[in-house]
Regions:
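Acidic, metal/ion-coordinating pockets
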Residues: 1-238
Length: 238
């Protein structure tokens, strides 16, 4: 990411969920705290909560959200028995004089993962309800969707005005990203467990609208040297 940021100032680093809870030692050992610290070091701009993240429990998850130096989103998760959202539904970022909305959607398995402490509302209905509000505030709309590829293919026809969907939950790799010609929506997904990184470049026209895109999926092999700062951070957990 440091190399990418050297060549472009207009970069968003996003995560599509199931990142804080997992079977890997670092996540289990620290209940996701080290993951958040690493994401802070990398300069993440936003992530969406995945269903597995709720296995940490709400109290621990709230602590991780406080530690994060970036917004952790979910527009469709509410505390059981209330209409109170558990997380921020969306955030507006200003990138190169363009206002970019980033919305988070969590799959409905989150409710069982949290032991019934939360309810995951219908994500499509939630998105439709949000789009008018968000479209008035932003030039570009990105959805961080922890719903899986099949659901992501349906989103552009269910809610107009989405420019980019960054997908998680399913293990699909879309290489290159798909383009929904009818809606103009780009759909990107890069697999799971940090094995790959998806890169999408959006071209903006003079009206502040998306006029084109390019995308690729990069496999993170040993040819990429360790970042010294990140290596030093990880070494403290050995």
């Amino acid at each position: 990411m440091k190399e990418v940021r050297k060549t472009s100032e207009n970069v968003l680093l996003l995560d599509a969920g199931n990142t804080l809870f997992g079977n890997r030692p670092l996540a289990k050992q620290t209940q996701g705290q080290a993951i958040v610290e690493a994401m802070n070091l990398m300069g993440y701009d936003a992530m969406v909560l995945g269903s597995e993240d709720f296995r940490l429990g709400l109290d621990v998850l709230r602590q991780r959200m406080e530690e994060a130096e970036f917004p952790i989103l979910s527009a469709n998760v509410v505390i059981s028995g209330t209409d109170q959202l558990f997380a921020t539904p969306y955030v507006i970022k200003e990138i190169a004089d363009h206002k970019v909305a980033i919305i988070g959607l969590t799959n409905q398995e989150a409710a069982s993962a949290a032991g019934g402490d939360i309810v995951a509302l219908d994500p499509l209905e939630t998105l439709r309800d949000l789009m008018d509000e968000v479209s008035e505030e932003a030039d570009v709309v990105i959805v961080l969707s922890h719903l899986g590829a099949e659901a992501n293919f349906q989103l552009p026809s269910q809610a107009q005005g989405i420019d980019l969907i960054v997908g998680g939950y399913s293990r699909d790799v879309l290489r290159p990203p798909l383009w929904n010609e009818a809606s103009g929506t780009v759909i990107a997904q890069a697999g799971y467990q940090g094995q790959r990184i998806g890169i999408v470049s959006l071209e903006m026209d003079s009206q502040g609208k998306v006029a084109g895109h390019e995308g690729e999926v990069v496999v993170l092999t040993d040819e990429f040297a360790d970042d010294p700062e990140m290596r030093a951070f990880l070494d403290q957990y050995k």
